[in-house]
Structure formats: structure tokens, C-alpha cells
UniProtKB/Swiss-Prot annotation:
It comes from the Eukaryota. Coiled coil: none annotated. Residues 1-22 form the signal peptide. Keywords: Glycoprotein, Pheromone, Signal. It comes from Lachancea kluyveri (Yeast). GO terms for cellular component: extracellular region. It holds the Pfam family MF_alpha. This is Mating factor alpha. GO terms for molecular function: mating pheromone activity. The keyword Glycoprotein applies. InterPro entries: Mating_factor_a, Mating_factor_alpha_C, Mating_factor_alpha_N. Glycans are attached at N57, N67.
């Protein structure tokens, strides 16, 4: 989250300086010479697990970095999601009880009943 905040703040700051001109960069396409003190940071995007998406709404402009593995997993789970109308449920039916059968049973294993004992000065709760 800290990286995203720093990256967002940097991009917003750079965007606000739109009237400034870029410094001339010497070199060809394969090698670029940039002053070391002007570098803010470097993020290697060569891996397949990082994707960059541009974000633009009424208040924010910037780049969003996401983990592609998690995005693909979420998309596959949402494709398998069944909505209310498609859910597999048992059909409606009347409840039937045998003689002496309770309406529901408690699932938890409760401790057997016993008297409470308190030490001197011990609170009730």
C-alpha cells in the first residue's frame, strides 16, 4: 500500500507539472543517459505476474499495478458464480416431525451443567 501511495503521489505531482519541459536526453533507443539524482525509482515489469492499468476518474489519474495471478483467479471464480436464480436449492416442502423430535438441535458440544464457583474478589464476568 505504501508503494502504491508513493507511486500515485509521484504521478500526480508529475502530472501537475505539465507546463514544464522535459530535459533533453542523449543517447539512442538502446541506451539512455539520465542524471542519477533525477531518478525517483525503478520497478521491473518484466514478469508475467504484474500488470499496469491506467486509472482515470473524476478525482484520480494514474497507473494501477496489479498482480495478474490474483486477477485471473478472481475472474475465474466470478465466472463460476451462481446467482440467486441459478442456485441449486432443495424444492419447497412441508416439514415433518416424528413423535418427540425437536424442531432443531443444537450443534455445539456444551459443557455439562455445574455450579459456578468464584474465588475471593473474582468478578462474575
Amino acid at each position: 500500500m505504501k508503494l502504491f501511495t508513493t507511486l500515485s503521489a509521484s504521478l500526480i505531482f508529475i502530472h501537475s507539472l505539465g507546463s514544464t519541459r522535459a530535459a533533453p536526453v542523449t543517447g539512442d533507443e538502446s541506451s539512455v543517459e539520465i542524471p542519477e539524482e533525477s531518478l525517483i525509482g525503478f520497478l521491473d515489469l518484466a514478469g508475467d505476474d504484474i500488470s499496469v492499468f491506467p486509472v482515470s476518474n473524476e478525482t484520480h489519474y494514474g497507473l494501477m499495478l496489479v498482480n495478474s495471478t490474483i486477477v485471473n483467479l478472481a475472474r475465474s471464480e466470478s465466472a463460476n458464480f451462481k446467482g440467486k436464480r441459478e442456485a441449486d436449492a432443495e424444492p419447497w416442502h412441508w416439514l415433518s416431525f416424528s413423535k418427540g423430535e425437536p424442531m432443531y438441535k443444537r450443534e455445539a458440544d456444551a459443557e455439562p451443567w455445574h455450579w459456578l464457583s468464584f474465588s475471593k474478589g473474582e468478578p462474575m464476568y
